[in-house]
C-alpha cells in the first residue's frame, strides 16, 4: 500500500531556506556526492546508441536512460522500482536522475585548481607566500620546491632548477626533501599551521611601519583568516578527485545522418580521462621520471582547461578550431547561466503582436485579438467547458477549442472578464514599461493600446510590438489589478509628474477648441447654458473660437461639513469665454473651477491641469477626466481639420537683406584676416558668431510674421491677433514641431556641425521651402550621419549604465517606517549665476522635515519635525519666504539593511508616503537610467561659437532687496576708498524683506565691490566689477616694497609693449632660467614699515612675503610705497583654452563611477595659513600651517594655477589649486552632505540641460549605496583588520556587539566607491557573481566560506524565491515569525513533557541548521 501511495506523492513542498553557503569541497565530500567512478573516456556505442559501461554516460553510475527500465531490459515498469539489475548493474528508477547524479574521476596525481592559482590575486600564492610565477614553475614541472630542508642551509619553499637540485643532492644526500608538481604544493599547504601564521601576521602588522609591508600582510592575513574562520583546509585547493557533471547537463544528441551534437564538456572530460588513464599505466610500468612528469603536466593542463579554458596558455580547441566551452564559461557573461537562465527566463502564457491605436478604449483596457486570447486562456477555457458539461474530458474540450465552436467564444468572454493581462514593451526602462489592463476582445491580429499610456511605454504605432503576459494565480491577478493596472499608475516614479498626458492630435484639438478669435461669427452673444451654446454651434450660428458669454455650472466644495451634506454643490456663474471652452466645461471633474479651462490649452497647460486634478480630485476622477479629455481632443481635432500646405510656411521678406548684411560683415573679417589684424581662430569665431546671430534674426522675423495676423474687430478697427496659421498652431500648442523646426522650414537652416562636433562656418542660408542646392544638401547630411551613429552607441551605453545602477541599488528596500534619526540635509533653492534653477518648493516637496519649520514673522512652528511636506505645505513655505528647510534624506538614514519610509518621504509614483516593502533602489536606478538615451554622447568643445559665453566681468542684481555677504567674504579698502575683495570663495546674496535668499553670486578675488553688506538695492544694480583678462596679486598690508630674488635676466625679464612703449617685469618660466641656482629661487616681495623693519603678519612671527608666480607682470618698483589693496602684479588669464567639457551620458557615468578627474583641483587638508616652501624641479611647494603649528606640504606642478598666496588663511576643504573637484577629496574633507550635494548637482546639471526632470532623492539613493562601505582606521577589539573595507552595516553590528561586551569598538572613515565597485563588493556573492567578474567573485567567496543571506532582490530571483520587496517582504516576514513561534511552542512542549525524543538533538536545533 505504501508503495502505491508513494506513487501518488503530492507535489513536494519546496525546501524552505534562508541562506546559501559556498565553500571548497574536500576530496571526501566529492566522493560522497559521486555515484561511481568514470574510468573510460567512451561515451555511447555508435551502433546500439547505448551508453558504454564505466564511460562518461554510463547508466550504472548515472541512472537509466528510460523511465523505470534497466539498460539490458530485464526489469521494466514500475513494479521493479528501486531494484538494481544484476546483469547490467543499473538501478530501475526515473530517467531524470541523470540530471542530478554525479560521478568522479580518481586522479593519478593531484592537480591544482586553476581558479585558486590564476584568478588574481592568486590565493595559492597568498597562502604559501610565494609568487605566482614560482608556483607555476613548480606545478608545471619546471622547478623543484624545498618541502623539508632538514639540517641543510636550504629554506623551506625555496625554488631550485633541476641542475641545482642534482647538485644539492650530491652535496647533502637525502638530508632534505624537494618535490615537483602539485604533490609538492599540496605538501606545503598541508604543512601550514594557519592559527600560528595568523598570530604571527597580527603581531607583525602591529610592529611594522612600512606602508608596503602593511599592505602585503593585511592582504595575506585576510586570506588566512578566511580559511581559519570557514574551516576550509588550504590543501583542498589541490584536487585529488575530480567531480563529473551529470550527463543530462552535458548531453550528446544524435542528429539525422548519423552524426552527433555534443557539449564541449564531454570533449574536455575525455581528454582528462585519457591522460589520467595513460598516467596510471605509466606509473604501473615504472616509466622513466621524465615521461611521467610530462604526462602529469598534461593532466594538469587538461583539468585546467576543463575548469576554465583559456585562462592559462592557449585554449583547447575542438574539431572546428574554436576554443571549447569550459565549466567557467558556462556560468559567466551575458550568455552564461546567471544572466541567461536565472535572471531572465522565457515564460509561458505569453504572446506578442504589433500594436495599433485604440482610441475607443477606457484607460484601464486594452484590445486583445480573439485568437491570441483563445491561446493564452486555453486552460481556463478547458476548465469552464468541463464545469459546464459541454465537454466530458480535457481531450474533448481541446477539440471544441480547436474547432472554435460558438460556445467557445462565449466562454472566452466569461473567462477574461475581470482577468487583467500585463502588457510589456521592450526595452522596459522603468516600471511603467509593464502595466496591467483588462482585455477587450477584438477582431484582427493586432493588440490595441490606449493612446494615453503611450508616453509611459514610449510606444508609437510605426510597427512597435508588445508582449502580453497572463497572471495565473488569484494572488497574481490581485496584484496586477491593485498595483499594476494602468489607471493606478498615472504618475512617473522619476519625478511625480502625470504620465497620462495627451500629446499630438489630442493637444491640437484641445488647443484649437480653446483659442479665441477676434470678430468671429456670433461674437458677443450670451447663452443660458452650455447646451444652448452647443446647439448654436451645431447650427453654425457661432464658431468654436467665437468670444461669447455663457452661464456655466461648476461643482465647488461644500462649505457645509455636516453629516449627510453633499461634498460638492453647484455654483452658476456667467463667464466671458469662447464656445469651445464652454463645451469642454462639461467634462470638468467636480472640485475644479472653470478658470482652469478658460485659457488656450497648450501641452504644458494640459499637463498642469491633469496634475491639479490628481491633487485636488483624486485618482478616479483624474482618470475619467483624462479619458474624456482624450475623446474630446480627438473629436475636436477632426472637426478643426488642421493641415499643412506649402503656403503656410511664410518666408519673411526681410530675409534677403539680413543675410546680405551678414555676408558683408564676413567679407570684412576675411579682409582683416588677410591683412593680419586677426588670427585665424578669431576670424572663425567671429564668422560663426555672425551667422548664428543672423540665423536668430531671420527666425525671429519669421516667427513675428507667422504668429500674428491682421484682423478687423467688431468696431471696424484694424488690429492684430494670434495667428490661426496651421504650422504656427501646431508648434505653439506643443502638438508637433518646434520653433527651431519651423525656422528650418521658412527661415534659414543656419549653421551645421561636422561629425567631430565643430561648426562649419558656411551656413545654409536656404530653407526647405526654397529648397537646398547640392552643396547645402551635402553639408546638412555630413553632420546628420554622425547623429545616427551616435544614437546606436548611446543606446548600448545607456543600457549598461542602467544595469550598473540597478545592480548597485537592487538590495535597497524600505523596511521600516522610521529609523528615528535626527540627521538630514539643509535644502535651499538651487541658484546658478543668479538665476533660480530649481525653486525650494520643488526640492522639498514630498520630504519629511527633520527640524521644525518656523514662521519667520511670528516665530510660531508651522510644521513640526517629522511632517511630510505636501503641495499645500510647500506653497505656504514659499509664500512665507522661508529660504532653508532641513529635511530627511536617504543618505543619513540609520536603518541597517534597507531604508526607512521617513527618510525617503513620498513615493513619487503614487503621490503618498512610501510603503514599507517598496524597492526604492531599483526605482531610483530606473529613474536615472531611463532618460539615458535622451542624453547626448558628445563632449562640448568650448571655443566654437556654439557655446562661448562672453567672459563675465561684473555681477548685477536681478531682484530688489538687501545685499548680504557670506562669512567667507573678506575685503580691504584701498587708498581710493574702493573695497577690494581678497577672499577666494566669497559670495554675495540678495535677500528680500523677510530675509529670504533670492539669488547668490560668486565674487572673484581682486574684484571691486560697488555695494556693501546691508545695502538696499534695486534690480539691475551692479554689485561688483573686475578685469576678466587678468588675475591680480593684491597686498593686504601697506609699506615699502622690497624685492627678493627679482633679478633681471635671471628670474624676471623686461617686456616692452610694442604699441605703448611701456616696460614691465615678467617672471620667467623655471625651464627657461639659465643657472642652476636661479631655478630654485622664487621672486617675491617683502614689505618694510617706516622703520625699515619687515612687516609681520598680525599675531605671528612670520614676515609678510608675497610670491610672484611664473608669468606674473610685476607692476610695482623696488622701494615704492604701496597702500593696502594695491595691485602688486597681474597674471594674464590664458584666453579660454578650448577645453572639452565632458557632457551627457559619459559625465553621468563618470560621476557615479566616482572617478578622480585627470588634473583634479587640490583642496586644503586643514584650516591654516598658507606659505610657499622651497620649490623642487618643476613643482612648487605649498605649505599650510595649521592652528597648532603643524605643517602640511603639497607639491604642485608649476603650470597649475594656485588660488592662494602667501599668508592667506584657508579653510579645510577650500580649493587651493584650480581644477575639477575630486569627489573622494570632497568626502574626506567636507563630509557626506557636501559630497552628496556635489554629485546631485552635477548629475542634475546634465539632465537639466536635456530638459529631463529627476527628483533629487533618486540620486541620493545611489550615493547612499556608493557610501555603503567604510574603511577601518583602528580595529579596537573587533575581528577587522586596520585598512580593511567592510560593509557599513556589518561594522555597525560588530561595534554594537563590542559595546555590549564592554570591548573597544572599531573606528572608521567613509569610503566612496564607484557603482561597479560597489556592486562587486556587496555582501551577497550571488548578486556580485551575476554582475561582473564571476570567476573572481566565486573564488573569493569559496575560500571565505561565504554565506549569502539572500537579502537583496537579485539573489532571490536567482534562487527562485519571492523577492523581499512589496508583497514578498510581507510573505517572508510572516514566514519567519511563524517559524519562530513554532519553535517556541516546540521548546515549551519539550519542557513540559519530559519524554525522550528519538534523536539526541532536538529538532529545534535541526531547524536552525537546515537553514544554512
Swiss-Prot record:
EC identifiers of the protein: 2.7.7.6
Amino acids binding Mg(2+): 460, 462, 464
Cellular component GO terms held in the UniProt record: DNA-directed RNA polymerase complex
Highest taxon above the source species: Bacteria
Transmembrane segments: none
Residues that, per the record, bind Zn(2+) 2: 819, 893, 900, 903
Enzyme class label: transferase
Cofactor note: Binds 1 Mg(2+) ion per subunit.
InterPro entries referenced in this protein's UniProt entry, alphabetically: DNA-dir_RpoC_beta_prime, DNA-dir_RpoC_beta_prime_bact, RNA_pol_asu, RNA_pol_N, RNA_pol_Rpb1_1, RNA_pol_Rpb1_3, RNA_pol_Rpb1_3_sf, RNA_pol_Rpb1_4
GO biological process: DNA-templated transcription
Keywords from the named record: DNA-directed RNA polymerase, Magnesium, Metal-binding, Nucleotidyltransferase, Transcription, Transferase, Zinc
Gene Ontology MF annotations: DNA binding; DNA-directed RNA polymerase activity; magnesium ion binding; zinc ion binding
CDD domains given in the database record: RNAP_beta'_C, RNAP_beta'_N
Catalytic activity as recorded in UniProt: RNA(n) + a ribonucleoside 5'-triphosphate = RNA(n+1) + diphosphate
Binding positions for Zn(2+) 1 per the UniProt entry: 70, 72, 85, 88
Record family assignment: Belongs to the RNA polymerase beta' chain family.
Function statement: DNA-dependent RNA polymerase catalyzes the transcription of DNA into RNA using the four ribonucleoside triphosphates as substrates.
Protein name: DNA-directed RNA polymerase subunit beta'
Organism this protein belongs to: Paraburkholderia phytofirmans (strain DSM 17436 / LMG 22146 / PsJN) (Burkholderia phytofirmans)
